[in-house]
Amino acid sequence: MKCGNGIEARQVNELFINVDPIQAGGRLTGDAIKAIIAYGDGYSVCDNCRKPNRLDCIAKPPIAEFHKDVAAWLNMDAARMMPGARRGFQAVAHTYVSKGNPVLLTSLSHYTEFLAVEGAGGVACEIPADSNHLVTPDAAAAKIEEVKQKFGKAPVLAIIDHVDYQYGNLHDFAGIAKVAHQYDVPVLYNGAYTVGTMPVDGKVIGADFIVGSGHKSMASPAPSGVLATTAERAKEVFRTTGITGDVTGRKFGIKEPELMGCTLMGATLVGMMASFPHVKERVKHFDKELVNNRIVMEALLSIEGTKILSEYPRKHTLTRVDTTGSFDRVAETHKKKGFYFSSALNDKGIFGLIPGATRIWKFNTYGMTEKQTRYLADAFVAVAQENGLPVK
């Protein structure tokens, strides 16, 4: 089936159990799909844009109400929807970071955090993770002291992942934020893998800013995300324009420079809005997600030579696995080499592993039913047994 000239209709989620680590939390709800069709035209949400002529103030569809609801849901004071989490990082970095300023990141930070700092002219200063791939408050304190010695001042900003993309480990964000605040360092909470999948309370964790990814964890179309702030920081990041044309004398009302005037628009925004009631409900049941994930973990660990590189027991559904001692042993002599593994799983209706990967790889069980996770667990064991690997 085609949906355009040379464009094959994508049917991955209809035909397979999808374990792709970055796709699990972004699968659309039925309501979001309907919203995309209804609001697919470019400026569709602007039908009723009136003074003050800013998108987040539109009442129909209820965009203004949605922004207030998201801020309240995260227990923050203000929020704007962004074209992806990376644009949230960018807005905050551009506001607080100047050329040569030190910015606190971690050794597990996503590349988009580095690029946001680079774009603002800052210097990346990484808190090293420990041997368990965890970033700790003590390590944060030591790094801040190191930065003070080197730069003569504390970092101007800290960007800290609650759950990192490499291991899916849950870091002590609240503890790190407490340390950073002792040095008057504002802290950005990177919730790309948490906002929309598990409960997040900005006041409790001590975040000055919360960034979430709509297309990664809020069942939303891409590119979409959220930037939420405290009231104090909202005045700075969501400041309004002050520029005036020297010939025309034109001014631009209450447009916000860090959003290039307006918040996220069109089908992406309304898709987020349509999924939001479902997202608010599902974060209440994250414990069930961990129960389902455990089923797969136990199956993988029953295959001799398999190791879980992420913290264990798991506190998140994104997991990094080392099968150098199991599935990669088969790849050494298999006629398909490492491609046999993803091929065998595809034949069993499982999609999302990088083709050819049999050593270290990641997967995500978020959103699966218990029946699906049991099927996935059995599939891993079956592939092992079919290829002569010992199973406990």
UniProtKB/Swiss-Prot annotation:
Matches recorded under PANTHER family: CYSTEINE DESULFURASE, O-PHOSPHO-L-SERYL-TRNA:CYS-TRNA SYNTHASE
Family: Belongs to the SepCysS family.
EC number(s) per entry: 2.5.1.73
Role noted for this protein: Converts O-phospho-L-seryl-tRNA(Cys) (Sep-tRNA(Cys)) to L-cysteinyl-tRNA(Cys) (Cys-tRNA(Cys)).
Record's catalysed reaction(s): O-phospho-L-seryl-tRNA(Cys) + hydrogen sulfide + H(+) = L-cysteinyl-tRNA(Cys) + phosphate
The species this protein was found in: Methanoregula boonei (strain DSM 21154 / JCM 14090 / 6A8)
Pfam families: Aminotran_5
Binding site for pyridoxal 5'-phosphate: 85-86, 190, 213-215
A biological process term (GO) from this entry: translation
Cofactor(s) required for function per UniProt: pyridoxal 5'-phosphate
Keyword Transmembrane helix: no
Subunit comment: Homodimer. Interacts with SepRS.
One MF annotation (Gene Ontology) recorded for this entry: Sep-tRNA:Cys-tRNA synthase activity
Protein name: O-phospho-L-seryl-tRNA:Cys-tRNA synthase 1
Superkingdom of the organism of origin: Archaea
Residue positions, PTM N6-(pyridoxal phosphate)lysine: 216
Keywords on record: Protein biosynthesis, Pyridoxal phosphate, Transferase
